[in-house]
Structures are given as C-alpha cells and as structure tokens.
Amino acid sequence: MTQPTITQDTARQPNPNITLYDTMQRQKVPFVPGTPGYVGMYLCGPTVYSDAHLGHAKKEVAFDVIRRALTHFGYQVRYVSNITDVGHLLNDADEGEDKLQARARLEQLEPMEVADKYFWSFFRDMDALNVLRPSINPRATGHIQEQIKLIEELIEKGHAYESAGSVYFDVRSWPEYGKLSGRKLDDQEEGTREAVRDEKRDPRDFALWKKAEPEHLMRWDSPWSVGFPGWHIECSAMSLKYLGEGFDIHGGGLDLQFPHHEAEIAQAEAAGHHFARYWMHNNMLTIGGEKMSKSKGNFTTIQDILKKYDPMVVRFLLVSSHYRSVTEMNEEAFASAANGYRRLSETLHEIERRLKDAPAGSDTALDSKIAARVTEFEDAMRDDFNTPKAVASLFGLTGELNTALNAGPVGRDTLERARDAYRSLGGDVLGLFAETGSAASVAQDDASVIDALMDLVLKARQNYRLQKQYAEADELRETLGKAGITVEDTKDGARWKR
C-alpha cells in the first residue's frame, strides 16, 4: 500500500513548526508529515446504531478543528473517518450481539436500514455543528474483502489462528502489544476477568473474524466460515487502503486507546505494514463531574441539546476547552458559552455593518493590534492546537476592536482586515462562523435577515425622533426591549444588541 499521489499543483511545503501531543511517545513532539505538504488523517468514526451524543460532538469538533488548522497552515489534508456498521458487539469485546442487529430487532428494521438511518442522523448533527465532511467516509460492510486479506496476511505470518470457524489474533506472538496504552502483557493477563473460551488460546486474544451463529443476520463468506469481521480489523484495513503505509495522524477518543487502537496497531504492524506515525486522543465529557456515558444514563444526544442551544454555542463551548482536557457540560457552562459566542458574533456583525459606509483609509495602530492578535492565535494553534488560548486571542481582538468602534469611524482598510481576521481565525479555523449554504449557517442567515430588519426599525425610530414623535420612538424601543434587544443611542447613531 502506497501513499496517495500528490499532484505538482497541490503539493506544498509549509513549515508552521507545529507541535502535538503524541500518545505513543507520551509527550509533545514536533509534527513532521511523512510527505512534505501533505497530511493523511484517520479518525475512528461512529458505530451507527443510535443517535449521536455530546461525546461524539467533542471528538468530531476536536479533530475538525485540527484538520482546519492544518489546512490553514498550508497543508493538503486527506481526512478519512470510518463508519462502523458491523462487528461492534454490545460489550465492546468478542461476545454478545452486534449493536446494529440488537437495534434492528428493537426497531423491527433490517440492520442496514438501521445503519442508513443513523448514518444520515449523524451527518445531520455534524452539519449543524459545522463539522466538515470527511474526504472519504468508508463503511466497514463495504470493505469485507480488504479485512479478509489482512487477516490472511496475519495467519500467514503466524500472528493469527483459526479456531472453530473464527479467527483470533495471537497476542503472545506480538511482544509489542500494549505499547500505545502502556499496558504490559503480563499485567493484562493478571487483570483479565474473561474466561478462556475453548476456541481461544489466550483470554487476551481478540477476534479478527467471527463465525456467525444461525440467528446472526449480518454474514459474509470467508475462507474460515460464514461470519463477520471483528470490530478492530476494519480500521486497520481501511486506513491503510485510503491513506497508505505510515500515514500521519490517527485520532480518536481516549476511551478507544485500549483495546481498539492497541489492536489496530498490532494487526497492521504484525502483518508487516508501517502504521500511523502520530496518535492523538481527545478527552471525555463530564456532567456534574461524572463521565458522560450511556451505561450511566447521563448522556445527552446532540439533537436534544440543539433543541435548547444554537449549534454554534455548542461548538463554542467545545472549542473553549482543549481537546486533551475534560469538558464539563452544565447549564452554567452553556450560558457562559452563549454569552461568549454572542460577543464574538455581534462584533463581526458590527464590523460588517460599519463597512457599508466606512471612510477610506486605515488606522495604523489598530492594524498593528490586529496583526499581533493573528500571530498570537496562530502561535496558540501551533502549540498542540491550543484552542482555549486561540479563543482568548479572539476575545482580545474583540475588546480592542470594540474600543476603536466606540471611539468613532474606523477606516475601510482596517475594518476589512478585522473582518478577514475574524472570518479566517474564528470561521475557517475554529468553525464558529459557518460558510454560506451549510446547515450550520442557517442561524447566521437568520441573523443577516434580522440585521436588515433592525436597520429598517432603527430608521423608522429615527424618523419618529426627527418628527418629534417621541412617544412612538419610545414605544418601538420598549417593544424591542421586551424581545431582548437593547437600543443604544450614540454619536454615530443608534446601535442595537441582544
């Protein structure tokens, strides 16, 4: 398997001096792609058997920002994220019912109907959160032959064995098993609570292929039995197919570090393939200090949270926390995020409003402040994608711009630089200002309509004042106040905010 070809037109050699935290090395290290100008990223995607929850949102937004930042710094990024639609069993191990099949029985649907239903549900949620679509979105069921081929390679090299129609990875044959998580093989043996199945040589061996029971609906022919692939093999096979040997970044949630990512490495490397060069993991969400999980019943779906909060407020809350930090989700955190996002978006709207009739020229002092904040933002993103510091830079810029805007007219050139900085850093990198036409831009499209309507309302109020119809002008102001809109009279005319 080879690295995808880069054309001469798109190949670049940026050198932004990025450092990232590599889980394998357990420290921050310089990021040097295997191919200059190109980054291959693989993210473990969802198992599509139910609606996505906020834990999925944390992971997807975190790696979306990393992808956006790499693009901002000049890299061509191929971003692959899989869809698990077979092989993920209820206990995340080798026994139990397939999660999709269990849901299919509950909803009285075919497993593939369940997969399609929640596949599209997942992407509606991601679109709302302004998460860019992956370059490639491979589904496990569409890559059965690639998985079988990798299993055959492992058997041939003596790292896997067939037993009663199933195939297992022989962990004792691969001494490096456990190097990502730091778990020693002997410690794993002492700590295991799984009884050794007759068909397993060792309780720590994991399934590469499972023989299907008669009631199992999802099944394919293989050299060993009619069955289905194990959960771990799909990611090894598909990442190598679409990103090639030694691709750059493999990402996922911290909960996947063991056993899933550990198994991926063992499968790929034992078969003779050079696997991922950097490993990145996002941390978890907590609610009331407890880890959010379905087993605890304290999880919230993305759809439910979007009924209460603007999608960009949810995204703002997520990027305000470092991807390697725990993010606490509560009403206070959402209220703070709503205020913070409102401050940024209102400043951008005010800049765009002022541009309509801004005087020519620029403000050298303010231009210097804008440039300094851009540098500050980019330095934060170079340092292991430190989004909290990057957001703080945007707030610093916001304060400086509002001070200048309140002091009087600002030159067009400077306003354009400020607008471009907001759109580039807050929009293109952090994804907080959605592109026109995307699902996430709907609320912002609505905001544009509100801006236009408010211009008309303020002009009507000004006409009342000019005609000395002060009662009518005050009534308009009071009505707006009841709707949560504050009108401020300044020397440059009336301004409004929510």
Curated annotation (Swiss-Prot):
A motif ('KMSKS' region) lies at residues 291-295. The keyword Protease does not apply. Keywords: Aminoacyl-tRNA synthetase, ATP-binding, Cytoplasm, Ligase, Metal-binding, Nucleotide-binding, Protein biosynthesis, Zinc. One of its GO terms (cellular component) is cytoplasm. InterPro entries: Cys-tRNA-ligase (IPR015803), Cys-tRNA-synt_Ia_DALR (IPR015273), Cys-tRNA/MSH_ligase (IPR024909), CysS_C (IPR056411), Rossmann-like_a/b/a_fold (IPR014729), tRNA-synt_1_cat_dom (IPR032678), tRNAsynth_Ia_anticodon-bd (IPR009080). ATP binds at K294. GO terms for molecular function: ATP binding; cysteine-tRNA ligase activity; zinc ion binding. It catalyses: tRNA(Cys) + L-cysteine + ATP = L-cysteinyl-tRNA(Cys) + AMP + diphosphate. It is an enzyme of class 6 (ligase). It is found in: Cytoplasm. Its cofactor is Zn(2+). It holds the Pfam family CysS_C. GO terms for biological process: cysteinyl-tRNA aminoacylation. A motif ('HIGH' region) lies at residues 46-56. Its EC number is 6.1.1.16. Zn(2+) binds at C44, C235, H260, E264. It comes from the Bacteria. The keyword Methyltransferase does not apply. Binds 1 zinc ion per subunit. Monomer. Belongs to the class-I aminoacyl-tRNA synthetase family. This is Cysteine--tRNA ligase. It comes from Deinococcus radiodurans (strain ATCC 13939 / DSM 20539 / JCM 16871 / CCUG 27074 / LMG 4051 / NBRC 15346 / NCIMB 9279 / VKM B-1422 / R1). The lineage of its organism: Bacteria, Thermotogati, Deinococcota, Deinococci, Deinococcales.
